[in-house]
């Protein structure tokens, strides 16, 4: 069964590698604007005009390949459907947001209220799909289990909304989000194999394959960005996978980078309002803080490659620690 997932991953990666250049050509041919650049970060000046919405390619390819594989290998289960649904619907939200920004020149895209309402609705539907295949509504913490009944629906909504936006914040420099999420998903692939949840493993490996294919064009200097269509989908997918594998708490370690990125923004905003304009960090999310010199006081900060490598290694180490703790209990 693991081999089936690996084959799906390789197919997804190859199709993504073939599809991305054509997507980039489409953007250039239509002379569409790229993802907005940060004026405060001089290193980002060269990114102006770089195509975005690349997540559309790896999301669609991952969805199609995993669906075909699930039907062929008999893994079209409630768990697979739930993961597939969340990944697809969060991609739809991101696609609409990107579409308004890029094609309609509406800088704001979807409003915060529109995004939140859509995410809540997806969370509610996800709860009912998940409940069809689950007899209990249990949250797992190490060796303890907590059956929270109907409140599990609220947990799913909060979990999905929180993690989707956290990954969205992490997608700020070349290659950062794509490989960080790939590492996180690899940890969940290990858990899926250990518990023989090959239905969930199938879509996990398909998404990893898509991310690796996308990274070929997203590493520094990026030829394309994933956009909200990619980052929101990946965050929601990570959240639902942790639930489906009954390993919710592990995401706090496996996804520590996303937590830190989000907390840096929250702390910055709160401190800015409290002090009337003072800042804790040079810029948030925190990866931009390191780009601008961090706490060193120097004008020159870390290169994007250095930030990527540090964040990837941090995620890999914490993922291993999370797995060790998980299997110990």
UniProtKB/Swiss-Prot annotation:
Cofactor section: Mg(2+)
GO biological process: cell division; cell wall organization; peptidoglycan biosynthetic process; regulation of cell shape
GO molecular function, one term: phospho-N-acetylmuramoyl-pentapeptide-transferase activity
TM stretches of this protein: 1-21, 53-73, 76-96, 109-129, 141-161, 173-193, 198-218, 237-257, 309-329
Record-level GO cellular component terms: plasma membrane
Pfam families associated with the record: Glycos_transf_4, MraY_sig1
Keywords: Cell cycle, Cell division, Cell membrane, Cell shape, Cell wall biogenesis/degradation, Magnesium, Membrane, Metal-binding, Peptidoglycan synthesis, Transferase, Transmembrane, Transmembrane helix
Presence of keyword Translocase: no
Documented EC number(s): 2.7.8.13
Membrane topology type: Multi-pass membrane protein
Subcellular location: Cell membrane
Function: Catalyzes the initial step of the lipid cycle reactions in the biosynthesis of the cell wall peptidoglycan: transfers peptidoglycan precursor phospho-MurNAc-pentapeptide from UDP-MurNAc-pentapeptide onto the lipid carrier undecaprenyl phosphate, yielding undecaprenyl-pyrophosphoryl-MurNAc-pentapeptide, known as lipid I.
HAMAP family assigned: MraY
Record family assignment: Belongs to the glycosyltransferase 4 family. MraY subfamily.
Name under which the protein is recorded: Phospho-N-acetylmuramoyl-pentapeptide-transferase
Annotated gene: mraY
